[in-house]
């Protein structure tokens, strides 16, 4: 019987290539998923997978390649994410998260979703990675944004060093994040006017000058935040500074 343990699929005499799973694609279409290989790297198990849609004979890698990663792999992550970007625990279900997507990236950045103590941090990170300010699944990011994230809890620290891929002096505070979206924000990643964000999720934000310390000052903040706790902050290059094709972390 197939089991899921800390980001790894476990099965007696399990061998990649010997098993085909029944699943659904991101658009809810039924697919068959073949596990072609498994490799341990950086404390995580990465799977090469291929999928076949119903009534098709063609097997393809569902993970979209980039110039840097031609054959993306996937992590096995407990739970499923709906169209709003919300994570749901569904008995017996897990997600194959492609390595170039927010779910897998947040794991490699330090928030292991199979660690119960980090589940909310990981979910807040996925909102940050997508710049999902309203927490409704809409993304305000784009390729090659340069981001530095930190949580102040000792898991991921703010970057203060100058490196070839990141300059702290050029990055400014963007937002603080919860699993439900932005807790507050100073600006948007793509220079979308803050008024437009307020229109996209009416009743969610109000103008604010909350000072979170260390230069992190909000322009908009959640109207109701009594039951929420900001978990992740991020800084990024303002849009006019987006000149380098990399992400710190």
Question: Which positions does each model-derived feature cover?
Answer:
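Long, compositionally biased low-complexity segments
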Residues: 2-249
């Amino acid at each position: 019987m197939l089991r899921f343990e800390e980001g790894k699929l476990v099965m007696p005499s399990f061998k990649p290539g010997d098993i085909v799973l029944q699943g659904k694609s991101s658009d809810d279409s039924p697919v068959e998923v073949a596990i072609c290989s498994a490799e341990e790297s950086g404390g995580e198990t990465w799977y090469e997978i291929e999928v076949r849609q119903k009534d098709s004979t063609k097997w393809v890698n569902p993970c979209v390649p980039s110039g840097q990663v031609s054959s993306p792999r996937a992590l096995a992550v407990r739970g499923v994410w709906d169209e709003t970007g919300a994570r749901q625990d569904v008995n017996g279900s897990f997600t194959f998260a492609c390595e170039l997507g927010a779910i897998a990236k947040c794991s490699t950045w330090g928030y292991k979703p199979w660690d119960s103590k980090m589940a909310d941090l990981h979910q807040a990170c996925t909102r940050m990675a997508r710049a999902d300010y309203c927490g409704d699944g809409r993304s305000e990011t784009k390729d090659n944004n340069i981001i530095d994230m930190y949580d102040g809890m000792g898991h991921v620290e703010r970057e203060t060093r100058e490196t070839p891929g990141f300059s702290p002096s050029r990055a400014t505070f963007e937002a603080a994040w919860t699993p439900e979206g932005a807790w507050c924000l100073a600006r948007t990643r793509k220079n979308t006017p803050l008024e437009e964000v307020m229109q996209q999720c009416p009743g969610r934000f109000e103008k604010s000058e909350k000072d979170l310390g260390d230069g992190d000052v909000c322009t908009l903040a959640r109207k109701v935040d009594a039951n929420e706790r900001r978990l992740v902050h991020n800084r990024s290059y303002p849009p006019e500074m987006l000149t380098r094709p990399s992400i710190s972390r």
